[in-house]
From Swiss-Prot:
Subcellular locations according to the entry: Virion
Record protein name field: Protein VP3
Catalyses which reaction(s): a 5'-end diphospho-ribonucleoside in mRNA + GTP + H(+) = a 5'-end (5'-triphosphoguanosine)-ribonucleoside in mRNA + diphosphate; a 5'-end (5'-triphosphoguanosine)-ribonucleoside in mRNA + S-adenosyl-L-methionine = a 5'-end (N(7)-methyl 5'-triphosphoguanosine)-ribonucleoside in mRNA + S-adenosyl-L-homocysteine; 5'-triphosphoadenylyl-(2'->5')-adenylyl-(2'->5')-adenosine + 2 H2O = 2 AMP + ATP + 2 H(+)
Source species taxonomy: Viruses, Riboviria, Orthornavirae, Duplornaviricota, Resentoviricetes
Organism: Rotavirus A (strain RVA/Human/United States/Wa/1974/G1P1A[8])
Region named 2'-O-methyltransferase activity: 246-428
């Protein structure tokens, strides 16, 4: 959902759009809540309040002030991520296809021959990091840039087995135009760029688990973050390979040698970071043209010093000359060295050229060893060729994608590698490595062990759900790690499947009830965005590969109505009730009937079941941004800090009733996941609340009326306002509560309209207008540790006779209270009060 705030209405009508006029009779929170539960995707918010916009944005719902028709058109036509702190809108808008255009935010691609393989009449446009260069297209009151690019298609092509780029591109664009937008992936880079600076500013030691290539630029500014990935392919792993021959396979129609070099250097930088936690100087031999340096510098400031007889235009310092063994002493400590020296074959005889290449490989290794043998804080990435070679068994082998699979590969060496054992590797084994192994990640750090790290802040986004990990170990880590942001795949199946297929692996699935946490927030992607200064126009889909975001050690835990709050909790219910259900009251009716309350008169205003909890359970796939467990816990300990809105404190029994209704709903829907979730939430409610039941009561609270509009044969027809199980020395406490509640009790507007047989030989009249006061009374008794109410639902009624009678219906009649009293069952009245 997106909320576009306008000062004036617009004449044009837009699809899937609704207008909301700010209600001055309600505060900003109540207006925000009402907006969040509207069912259309676009909300035009008139006479808006800035505070209401802020509330929505902090809840993860994109809400933007719009000052002109151009701004409105730009935002209503596409989805976007909004940085509400810095007032930047990141559009995810692919309408540029109508210009016969694809876009990239990687400069090196523009220097290739990719243009020869685009769709006929199409062009490639470089738009800068996250589309920053497009800012000039939008002369708006807020900063606006289009972050949509086709880099995902280009990179997927590079790693695919397909060679025809034009066909691949065409298929992917058609897929993009016919499937829902992968909004989380599109906004994830914006999120990471917002998330990690804020974490690093607060926490000295940060661990990041499972980064992939899409994060390769994000972390260049954070050398102190310790990365964990899937580990490196090292020389000793080649022992498993059988010898092969030269393959010579074409990988890409257009030249991606630049991409390969960039990946090699970035891999080396992150390897250096994990050893030394600082930025290195970057030396490169055989550097020309290295257009990708421009891309690196768009993200982070590095010093590049390069050697090559040809130009390297984006280098900090370039030496237009060859580099020799004797020049190694020019290279300083605290650096990385990338050696990419190889003579081009040209028209040279193959055998002669092969001899030169092997000599250069030995020379490259000698330079690498000499560089690493002196000084400190050094890492080298060196170009090698498939030949009989001795290499350190701990050397890291790289084979990032390049235009053709031929005979080249790379090795990363550190100062410890050069003093470890070397192993002879025959040429055929290196060919087996080149032919069968593609390095898919610039992060080659060791795997993360599922253990807590008390002094570190752990970030693990989309990294731990894989069934290679022990599910219980993942749960234990989340339960015990004091400071972290960890995601796990949500169980949004209908058969309560413990793990689900994802690509070529399986993921464990989780529900919020799998974790035992305090001071932690469990929310969705959009709920998490709101906590870190962002909001989004399209929330996560109810099915598919979605994740719970679990934030441990946050200072926002107590801010219940600001973050991961109840905004939108009824939205799915509204969509169903007002479109396909039997009546818009269907939810109210079902909740009462499923708890054996058959008096449906006024069910939409007088109900015994928490609608919040009920909707949060049965539609959890749609509204898990709302942290239900946190909401329950803070209520249970009486620490609900509320800034505004229409606040109603639920009695714990109302939450139990909601769980019972949700369980019956789940059974009817054959939804085993909701059934378990509702059972576990009910168990959690019973755990955090000390609920006791007066199922064998000894006292009751009665209400006597001036008159009853029915015939009766009991001595005094009365409404039992509740039963208690108390000792005699608690009578004073009960009376104190009744006196505090006196005004509210006598203000009850009780009415009756029919009689019925409650059970065999029990003839009663209905009583409406009681429940809201009953639950307030329940809460007061609960806080005073007085057992009040039974385990079955309280159904207000007035007993008229203990014999079978003919039921009657009358016009709704108000009943005037005469007195309210406390009486021992089968005993005497111990307290009586009148108005």
């Amino acid at each position: 959902m997106k909320v576009l705030a306008l000062r004036h209405s617009v004449a044009q009508v837009y699809a899937d759009t609704q207008t909301y006029l700010h209600d001055d009779s309600k505060d900003e929170y109540e207006n925000a809540f009402l907006i969040s539960n509207l069912t259309t995707h676009n909300i035009l918010y008139l006479n808006y309040s800035l505070k209401t916009l802020k509330i929505l944005n902090k809840s993860g719902i994109a809400a933007v002030e719009v000052q002109s028709p151009d701004e409105l058109f730009a935002l209503i036509r596409c989805n976007f991520t909004y940085d509400y702190e810095d007032n930047i809108v990141y559009l995810h808008d692919y309408s540029y296809y109508t210009n016969n255009e694809i876009r990239t935010d990687q400069h090196w691609i523009t220097k290739t021959d990719i243009i020869d393989y685009l769709l006929p009449g199409w062009k490639l446009t470089y738009v800068g990091y996250n589309g920053k260069n497009t800012r000039g297209h939008y002369n708006f009151s807020f900063i606006c840039q289009n972050a949509a690019t086709d880099d995902d298609i280009i990179i997927e092509y590079i790693y695919s087995n397909e060679l025809d780029f034009q066909n691949f591109l065409l298929r992917k664009i058609k897929e993009r135009m016919t499937t829902s937008l992968p909004i989380a992936r599109l906004s994830n880079r914006v999120f990471r760029d917002k998330l990690f600076p804020s974490i690093v500013n607060i926490h000295k030691k940060v661990i990041n688990v499972g980064p992939r290539n899409e994060s390769m630029f994000t972390f260049l500014n954070f050398p102190t973050i310790k990365q964990f990935s899937n580990g490196a392919y090292i020389v000793k792993h080649t022992i498993k390979l059988k010898q092969e021959k030269w393959l010579g396979k074409r990988v890409s129609q257009f030249d991606i040698g630049q991409y390969k070099n960039m990946l090699n250097v970035v891999t080396t930088i992150y390897y250096y970071y994990n050893l030394y936690y600082s930025k290195p100087i970057i030396y490169m031999l055989g550097s020309a043209p290295s257009y990708w340096i421009y891309d690196i510098k768009q993200y982070s400031d590095f010093t590049f010093e390069t050697w090559d007889p040809l130009d390297t235009p984006y280098s900090t310092t370039h030496h237009k000359e060859l580099f020799f063994d004797k020049d190694v002493n020019k290279l300083k400590d605290n650096s990385v060295l990338y050696i990419d020296i190889r003579t081009d074959r040209g028209n040279m005889d193959w055998k002669e050229w092969r001899k030169i290449v092997e000599q250069q490989t030995v020379s490259n290794l000698n330079i690498a060893y000499k560089y690493l043998s002196t000084g400190k804080a050094k890492v080298c990435c060196v170009k090698l060729t498939a030949m009989d070679l001795e290499l350190p068994i701990t050397a890291k082998l790289l084979h990032h994608p390049t235009t053709e699979v031929r005979s080249e590969f790379y090795a990363i060496l550190d100062v410890w590698d050069i003093i470890t054992i070397k192993r002879f590797i025959p040429k055929g084994v290196f060919y087996a490595f080149i032919n069968n192994v593609t390095t898919e990640n610039v992060f080659i750090q060791p795997p993360f062990k599922l253990k807590t790290s008390p002094t570190d802040y752990i970030v693990a986004l989309y990294a731990l759900s894989n069934d290679l990990n022990s599910r219980q170990d993942v749960i234990n880590l989340i339960n015990k790690q004091k400071q972290s942001l960890i995601t796990v795949r949500i169980n949004n199946t209908f058969k309560d499947e413990p793990k689900v297929n994802f690509k070529n692996i399986y993921d464990w699935t989780f529900l919020p009830t799998d974790f035992e946490l305090k001071d932690s927030i469990i929310t969705s992607y959009d709920g998490c965005l709101g906590i870190f200064g962002l909001s989004i126009s399209l929330s996560s889909k109810p099915t598919g590969n979605n994740h719970l975001f679990i934030i441990n050690g946050t200072d926002k835990y107590d801010k219940l109505d600001q973050y991961a709050n109840h905004m939108g909790v009824s939205r799915r219910s509204h969509q169903i009730r007002f479109s396909e259900s039997a009546t818009s009251y269907s939810g109210y009716i079902f909740r009462d009937l499923s708890n054996n309350n058959f008096n449906l008169i006024g069910t939409n205003v007088e109900n015994s079941v928490s609608g919040h909890v009920y909707n949060a359970l049965i539609y959890y796939r749609y509204n898990y941004a709302f942290d239900l467990k946190r909401w329950i816990y803070l209520h249970s300990i009486g620490k609900v800090a509320v800034e505004g809105g229409r606040y109603y404190e639920h009695a714990p029994i109302e939450l139990i009733y909601a769980c019972r209704s949700a369980k019956e709903f789940a059974i009817l829907q054959d939804d085993l996941t909701v059934l378990r979730y509702a059972n576990e939430i009910e168990g959690y409610i019973n755990k955090v609340y000390s609920i006791t039941y007066a199922d064998d009561p000894n006292y009751f609270i009665g209400i006597k009326f001036n008159s009853i509009p029915y015939e009766y044969d009991v001595k005094i027809p009365h409404l039992t306002l509740g039963v208690l199980f108390i000792s005699d020395n608690m009578i004073h406490d009960v009376i104190t509560v009744l006196k505090k509640m006196k005004t509210e009790l006598f203000k009850m507007e009780i009415s009756t309209s029919y009689t019925y047989m409650l059970s065999d030989n029990t003839y009663v009249a209905n009583a409406s207008g009681v429940l809201s006061t009953y639950f307030k009374l329940y809460n007061m008794f609960y806080r005073n540790h007085i057992t009040f109410g039974q385990s079955r639902m309280f159904i207000p009624h007035i007993t008229l006779s203990f014999s079978n009678k003919q039921t009657v219906r009358i016009e709704s009649t108000k009943l005037r209270i005469n007195s309210i009293y406390l009486r021992k069952i089968k005993g005497e009245t111990v307290f009586d009060m009148s108005e």
